[in-house]
Curated annotation (Swiss-Prot):
Higher taxonomy: Viruses, Duplodnaviria, Heunggongvirae, Peploviricota, Herviviricetes
Compartment list: Virion; Host nucleus
Pfam families: Herpes_V23 (PF01802)
Protein's name in the database: Triplex capsid protein 2
Keyword vocabulary terms for this entry: Capsid protein, Host nucleus, Virion
Species assigned in the record: Equine herpesvirus 1 (strain Ab4p)
GO molecular function: structural molecule activity
Subunit structure: Interacts with TRX1 and major capisd protein/MCP.
């Protein structure tokens, strides 16, 4: 017999107004991310203020990292005193589990769905004025489109750093399921979208630059293995750019170990770069949470509609 679903009671404040409660009831099927996996939690554990770091609001990269670190759950029911959410990844989903499409793309039967912060002009934020809280719901996006969307955003942000850069025709258009979507982020003003793109680009450029410098410092040492390693010898004989770099750029020899047993600095730098690049890839790569599974009815779910889901097999 299958184990029961892990349901979480998100307790609502007693002074929540009827209007705010009615707005919350329209959020059934949306995703929230919990700071801790408990049977009963407070509303403050899923509000926007829970993502703040040292009192500063989060940018998109920190939200992506939080989505990977926290525990995802789907709001199944909203009652006068609590919201009942089903946790993902710890137990089977309850029968009839569903999600609400909050992203810009249509969801199709069989799509693996991941969560993204609002990186475009599409934002799903609910303000509860009676208790002074805000809930920022993530965008539900198919996995392939989420990765392409992040790649396009980073490419546009890099292009915007070039003075007098002109956007290429069709660079901000995505096609999915027979429809055309305009994915134009506003990179001209220092608003939330601009800050998001800049933080993402700076982290990526830093990782690529550090990795290139570390590998460049190792090239002369690698080329000395040409007489012993057939693969390296083949690269040298090809007269490639790698060979030119090894001949023209004379790096300083690797220093002796510091403090006795300490490792070489260049290898420490390489290790740190691999760690940073791997972590950045995990954050921006997207993680499938659920999979759309419709047995009857329409196979395409538009924004604001609900769709039955099953757990992903990843």
């Amino acid at each position: 017999m299958a184990s029961a679903a892990f349901e979480i009671d998100i307790l609502l404040p007693s002074d929540l107004s009827p209007a705010d409660l009615s707005a919350l009831q329209k959020c059934e099927g949306k995703l929230v991310f919990l700071t801790a996996l408990r049977r009963r939690v407070m509303l403050s554990s899923v509000t926007l203020s829970s993502y703040y770091v040292n009192g500063a609001p989060p940018d998109t990269l920190s939200l992506m990292a939080a989505f990977r670190r926290r525990f995802p759950a789907i709001i199944q029911r909203v009652l006068p005193n609590k919201m009942i959410a089903a946790a993902l990844g710890v137990a089977p989903l309850p029968p009839g589990a569903f999600i609400q499409n909050t992203g810009p793309f249509d969801l199709c039967n069989g799509d693996s769905v991941c969560a993204l912060p609002p990186i475009l002009d599409v934002e799903d934020k609910l303000r509860l004025g009676s208790v002074g809280e805000e809930i920022l719901f993530p965008l539900t996006v198919p996995l392939a489109q989420a990765r392409e969307l992040i790649a396009r955003l980073v490419a546009r942000a890099v292009q915007a750093l070039t003075p007098n850069a002109q956007a290429q025709r069709g660079a901000e258009v995505m096609f999915y399921n027979g429809r055309k979507y305009n994915v134009t982020p506003d990179l001209r003003h220092r608003d939330a979208v601009n800050g998001v793109a800049r933080s993402l680009v700076l982290n990526m450029i830093f990782a690529m630059n550090e990795g290139s410098l570390v590998l460049l410092s190792l090239i002369p040492n690698l080329l000395t293995l040409g007489t012993q390693d057939g693969f390296v010898n083949a690269i040298i004989q090809m007269g490639s750019a790698t060979r030119e770099v090894g001949q023209l750029v004379h790096q300083q020899p690797v220093p002796q170990p510091q403090d006795g047993a300490r490792r070489f600095c260049v290898y420490d730098a390489l290790m740190s770069w691999i760690s940073v690049a791997s972590r950045l890839g995990d954050v921006v790569g997207g993680k499938p949470l659920v999979r759309i599974c419709t047995f009857e009815g329409q196979a395409t779910i538009s924004r604001g509609e609900k769709a039955p889901v099953i757990q992903t097999l990843l």
